[in-house]
Amino acid sequence: MDAWLSRAFADLAPLIQAGPVAPTIDMDAFRTQLRGFDFERPLAFEGVLQWTLQQMQHGIVQMSNPRYFGLFNPGAAFPAQCADRVAAFFNPQLASSASSPVPVEIESHVIRAMAHRAGLGPDATGHFATGGSEANYTALILALTAAHPGFASDGARAFSGPPKFYTSRECHIAWLKIAHQAGIGRSALRLIDTAGHGRLDPEALARAIAADRAGGAVPVMVVATAGTPGGGMIDPLHGCADIARAGKLWFHVDAAWGGAALAAERLRPLLDGIERADSITIDAHKWLATTMGCAMFITSHGALLSEAFHASTSFMPSSLAASDPYLNSVQWSRRFLGLRLFFVLATAGWEGIGAHVERSVAVVARVRDALVARGWTVANDSPLAVLDVVPPAALGEVRTLVRRVVAAGRAWVAPTNFEGRDVVRICATHGETSESDIAALVASLDLPMTGRP
């Protein structure tokens, strides 16, 4: 069956790459078929597997299609796909270093390598997480714990006033859910205005912190985003770090997407200042070509990480705060997530993965030049691989245009709002996007006006 599945994947790959990017499935018909699985009698696994592959071929946005220019989701590299199979075969439990010493050490090795790349000190530590939201939640918990030792036992009641933390209006809005989850309420998040170009305004940040303090609130954390979701912008890292240090606040860099620039020598200077962070989030599943669910939380405060997530029980095989993941992270039971990035880095090296990241930037530059030549207007000036553009008036309203492009199936882009303006958002993360894929995207965007096929 394993050989059959490998052949099926090999047969499907060219069909997916050449086929429509958006789902084409009839969901009513699918639900009718799905109701046939009543679980009252066993079915042959081969038939169930074949049926599932058919539904997946037509029932998802195909992020492995090189004409997917959408959100921060890459085509997964083959080594990362293999890592999932290895992890599933051995199925290690990474809660404890005693039960899974090799997987835990592999993950720690990758975390240390990424921390070194970011310029953090030799004592930096961290862990893999299911996504950027979990990693960012970890940052908030550490910030609250650092701000008041009583937070661990008393929660928000330990503070003399309501805790507050700060990030740009262009941030990933999952921060609202994170504040809710942490028990400090969504009003704890202060969204700071930009300076007009998609980057947080440090002067507005300083004013907000001062006003909150004057009103009796307790500022605890400043978050700078390195690669905003809408425009791919990088907040002023040094400016944010200066304000955080002056106010004795935790400084976190949400580099979930843009952190991949650390792999590329030409792009690393864009993240100058990240080395001053108390903690960093990087999602390998955004731009480092792993499968989904592979994020990293990195911090230079290992002792605080253990303090925030410590627990004591007699049934675990070990209780080493520095090395047992269940004692220094949100999760208890854990999958071997880090093997995906280990395989990618081991087989490509920093040079190879850096070339992958730089190639994405070059792809977006090619798209930009082609669209500008056709009368489109660029709305953002990201040095990374996100392009926000406004179509010529003759093409109509942005969201209607995007719906037409997606429905046609030749490419996938997204609408968003950047600095109060609706734009077509184009992002390149796929390692095999070709000149013909770029041409297909441009033709799809231009088609309503020109009528070209």
Indicate residue ranges for each PLM-predicted region.
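Active-site nucleophile and cofactor-binding loops and adjacent substrate-binding regions
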Residues: 102-103, 126-133, 167-168, 225, ...
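Short loop-beta-helix segment that forms the pyridoxal 5′-phosphate
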Residues: 114-142, 190-193
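Conserved PLP cofactor-binding pocket of PLP-dependent enzymes
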Residues: 381-386, 408-425
